[in-house]
Amino acid sequence: MLTRKQLDLLRFIQSRMQECGVPPSFDEMKDALDLKSKSGIHRLITALEERGFLRRLPNRARAIEVIRIPESLTQAAPAPQTPAEPRRFTPSVVEGGKSKQPPAPASTRMIDESGRAISIPVMGRIAAGTPVSAIQNQSHAITLSPDFVAGGEHYALEVRGDSMVEAGILDGDLVVIRKQDTANTGDIIVALIDDEEATLKRLRRRGSSIALEAANPAYETRVLGPDRVRIQGRLVSLVRRY
């Protein structure tokens, strides 16, 4: 769920892009939302990126890709300091100071063929620490842009623990996992140990053994026989909520 400020900013960016063909500047966004500094805009844009609504394009000034908008936004009031109610939104990429760019090619997969985000089941919690009981049944679902996933079957798990912090995975994050039973050395995987315990670790191989490596020096690497470990999937994306 987005905060009011996040919704206001998304609505303002959408409206400005439709009216002018270019995204607003940070100063314009700051003034529109009546914020005292541009750092607040940076935080809002980062939060919208992490929730799959916006994406900033690297090495380009004022380049913002709008991936999706919540359904409620199409029915909401006009954006701050925007004179007319925005038309129904069509995703596009625009770059400040230039004319509107054409939609990204199909290979970019910003949205699926029906124009909706993809629903990913959340299958409980996963330990980024000491292993926990095997993966539970689906508890709820989240929606993501197809940009966050490639082909194949996916599911999400809520992280518990701090053993993967140096890989940028924090307690409370949602990890998106591509379901597969093989992985390459160095991949972060969901490992099922002895068909009882599930853990999120980096895969290493030591001879015929499997090493489950933490990204935190406080945790030891576990080395197990291949008959004790089953790969349940590979990390492909991460969602952080605030």
Curated annotation (Swiss-Prot):
Keyword Metal-binding attached: no
Free-text function comment from the UniProt entry: Represses a number of genes involved in the response to DNA damage (SOS response), including recA and lexA. In the presence of single-stranded DNA, RecA interacts with LexA causing an autocatalytic cleavage which disrupts the DNA-binding part of LexA, leading to derepression of the SOS regulon and eventually DNA repair.
Listed GO biological process terms: DNA repair; DNA replication; negative regulation of DNA-templated transcription; proteolysis; SOS response
GO molecular function (one): DNA binding
Highest taxon above the source species: Bacteria
Entry-linked HAMAP family: LexA
Region (Disordered): 75-109
Keyword Transcription among UniProt keywords: yes
SUPFAM superfamilies xrefs: LexA/Signal peptidase (SSF51306), Winged helix' DNA-binding domain (SSF46785)
Organism listed in the record: Methylobacterium radiotolerans (strain ATCC 27329 / DSM 1819 / JCM 2831 / NBRC 15690 / NCIMB 10815 / 0-1)
Biased composition (Low complexity): 75-84
Active site: S163, K201
Subunit architecture: Homodimer.
InterPro entries: LexA, LexA-like, LexA/Signal_pep-like_sf, LexA_DNA-bd_dom, LexA_repressor, Peptidase_S24_LexA, Peptidase_S24_S26A/B/C, WH-like_DNA-bd_sf
Reactions this protein catalyses: Hydrolysis of Ala-|-Gly bond in repressor LexA
Family indicated by similarity: Belongs to the peptidase S24 family.
UniProt lineage: Bacteria, Pseudomonadati, Pseudomonadota, Alphaproteobacteria, Hyphomicrobiales
DNA-binding region range list: 26-46
Site features described as Cleavage, chain residue numbers: A128, G129
UniProt keyword terms in alphabetical order: Autocatalytic cleavage, DNA damage, DNA repair, DNA replication, DNA-binding, Hydrolase, Repressor, SOS response, Transcription, Transcription regulation
Designated gene of the protein: lexA
EC numbers, comma separated: 3.4.21.88
The protein, known as: LexA repressor
